[in-house]
Amino acid sequence: MILGVGESPSEGLRKGVVVNLEKTISAIQAAAVAAERMAGQRIESVVVSLGGTHTWSQNSTGVVAVAHPDHEIGEDDVHRVVEASRAISVASDRQVIHVIPRAFTVDGQDGVRDAVGMTGHRLEVETNIITGAQTAVQNVIKCVHGAGFDVEDVACAGLAAGEGVLTSQEIELGVCLVEIGAGTTNVVVYNEGSARHLAVLPVGGNHVTSDIAIGLRTTLDEAESLKLNYGHAVPDVIDQAEKVEVRQVGGDRIQALPRRFLAEIIGPRMVEIFQMAREEVRKTGFDQLLPAGVVVAGGGSRLMGTMDAAQSVFNTSARLGHPIGLAGLADKAYGPSFAVSSGLVKWGAHSRADHSDMRQAVTFGNTYQKTVRWLRDFF
């Protein structure tokens, strides 16, 4: 249940990466204080999202012999085979963030979802391994500790958004999540119950705002207001006679411009974002295997016409991703902007509910634990 919500401008971050420690720490503290005040409780630990184009995914496999004398597969065998899949070449400046099992194979029988309890001699696994830049990960954790909180778990922003807004049926059937943030866009492809591919695009809602500011010669604040109140991702649906008032740079001159002109600035950028996302789907080979279509979330999805643009580019159905499965302050945290944060709440709840160490080992692994211990010693 959601008890409190806090928001703060993400100063100190650029495209999901920390560029100023002090400003990032202050932003975390401001959001936390607001949430604590609303909830009437203190925050001790947090689940943190990792964003930025430094995160990407690759496929891997692992193979082990079943250890038990009766050849019944146990959780320890699953743990070993998942760990075996981690044996990939990773650059010294990168670290494994998540290892996501997709399917197991037992003595040649593939497509096994849960191998525990089955009988076999040879256990194989296909995994999706997500890595990130060590310094980027450490800087995020360092900021959270600097704000006075323990890090309970870490999740890539795209996976957290999926946890927040996707249904289990969509994940099973096949769906593409496009989470449009401020500086980046997360693209995650799901099929048969798991994440198959993750990518972070270097464009987001701030790029749309910047395009408007340049095209209309106005301030970024005015451009953001125009985008949210009058913007549209599909220019052709806007009446050519409709006007919007634009305050020019300097603040003295107000000019009436066609609203369609505003949409003609916005439209190409939104199409570009969806075309880049579609290319990521094509790379996976799942472009024809998305019966559940596309789910668009994030602050950038609040723009009018976004679903129409997504449907046009992907040539499939599209819906707006609202947080689901959370009780409490629904009106405060129901919008698509809360896709990642709502997913982090559910991520943390699942992590606590799982009393074994398997989920932590599978998702973030020993490298994260070493990073957290090092940062605790540092502080």
Protein language model regions, located:
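Short amphipathic alpha-helical segments
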Residues: 60-61, 189-191, 307-309
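Nucleotide/phosphate-binding catalytic cleft detector across ATP-hydrolyzing
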Residues: 1-177, 194-196, 205, 216-263, ...
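Short glycine/serine/threonine-rich phosphate/pyrophosphate-binding segments
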Residues: 162-163, 173, 180-188, 197, ...
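A short acidic Gly-Thr/Ser loop motif
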Residues: 50-52, 177-184, 190-193, 202-206, ...
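C-terminal structural cap/anchor segments
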Residues: 251, 255-326
